Design a protein with these regions (language model features):
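N-terminal non-catalytic cap/leader segment that marks the start of a structured domain
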Residues: 1-96
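Short, structured patches in soluble enzyme cores that scaffold and shape functional sites
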Residues: 5-7, 101-103, 126-128
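Structural motif
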Residues: 12, 21-22, 103-105, 112, ...
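Structural signature of FAD isoalloxazine-binding scaffolds in flavoprotein oxidoreductases
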Residues: 92-109, 124
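A structural-propensity feature for long, helix-poor, extended segments
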Residues: 108-129
Length: 130
């Protein structure tokens, strides 16, 4: 089950991602869960999964994605977690590097990613687990 936060017709919501659009869980479960973070914290995945086979409420063409969790408390990251990546940078420590990210450094699906002027390229290693 793929989940996302999004805007549709100027209304913020969250839902289940399907190829043809979104099942709007905000509309269906919003009285109990105000956003995707609340759904996850409130163990609402079982409730959400009841709608998996439903038709979409929102066409994909009208969706503007938001960062998955808009106001995370913490973003803890693991860097250099692949052996091949460590070799690329001549790192011999077998333990991965831990670092933090800030909420305002997130971007949404299909949103532009801005490269800092002092960087020559983007780093291609990026993963997110919630």
């Amino acid at each position: 089950m793929k989940l996302a936060s999004f805007i549709y017709q100027d209304i913020r919501s969250f839902g289940i991602v399907k190829a043809e659009g979104m099942i709007d869980l905000g509309r269906r479960l919003g009285d109990r869960y105000g956003d995707l973070k609340a759904l996850l914290q409130g163990n609402g995945l079982a409730e959400a999964s009841r709608y998996l086979d439903d038709a979409v409420d929102v066409p994909m063409g009208g969706v503007t994605f938001l960062p998955v969790i808009e106001q995370p408390e913490k973003i803890l990251c693991v860097g250099m977690n692949y052996a091949e990546k460590r070799k690329e940078f001549d790192q011999h420590n077998p333990a991965p590097t831990l670092f933090v990210r800030f909420a305002d450094s997130q971007t949404a699906h299909n949103a532009p990613v801005l490269k800092p002027r002092h960087s020559r390229e983007f780093d291609y290693e990026g993963e997110l687990a919630v």
